[in-house]
Amino acid sequence: MASFRTLFACVVILCCVLWSSMARYGEDMEVETEMNKRDVGVACTGQYASSFCLNGGTCRYIPELGEYYCICPGDYTGHRCEQMSV
């Protein structure tokens, strides 16, 4: 069974992905979405800042959970931006 920390991290990341998907429906929402995604966690530092995310993704860290995730550019998806969007 998943721990609460893992479950919470999945919910936070899922919310970011859903916001990202919704951004494609309007320019105003896209601006709001980009701001909301960047408000979750803090910028990664050290080796994670330059190597955790792939394909130009931006690394974010959630200190309360000790979890890393990526904000992916439009053509990529996945936990580390490892998959091309279809």
UniProtKB/Swiss-Prot annotation:
Subcellular location(s) per record: Secreted; Nematocyst
A GO CC annotation given for this chain: extracellular region
Disulfide-bond pairs as recorded: 44-59, 53-70, 72-81
Transmembrane segments: none
Keywords assigned: Cleavage on pair of basic residues, Disulfide bond, EGF-like domain, Nematocyst, Secreted, Signal, Toxin
A GO molecular function held by the record: toxin activity
Pfam families: EGF (PF00008)
Thylakoid as UniProt keyword: no
Propeptide: 24-36
Domain of life (superkingdom): Eukaryota
Alphabetical list of InterPro entries matching this protein: EGF-like_dom (IPR000742)
SUPFAM superfamilies per the UniProt record, alphabetical: EGF/Laminin
UniProt cross-references to CDD domains, sorted A to Z: EGF_CA
Gene3D superfamilies reported for this sequence: Laminin
Signal peptide range in chain numbering: 1-23
Database matches in PROSITE patterns: EGF_1, EGF_3
EGF-like domain: residues covered: 40-82
Described purpose of this protein according to its UniProt entry: Has both toxic and EGF activity. Its EGF activity consists of rounding cells (morphological change) and inducing tyrosine phosphorylation of the EGFR in A431 cells, but with a lower potency that human EGF.
Protein family (similarity comment): Belongs to the EGF domain peptide family.
Name this polypeptide is given: OMEGA-stichotoxin-Sgt1a
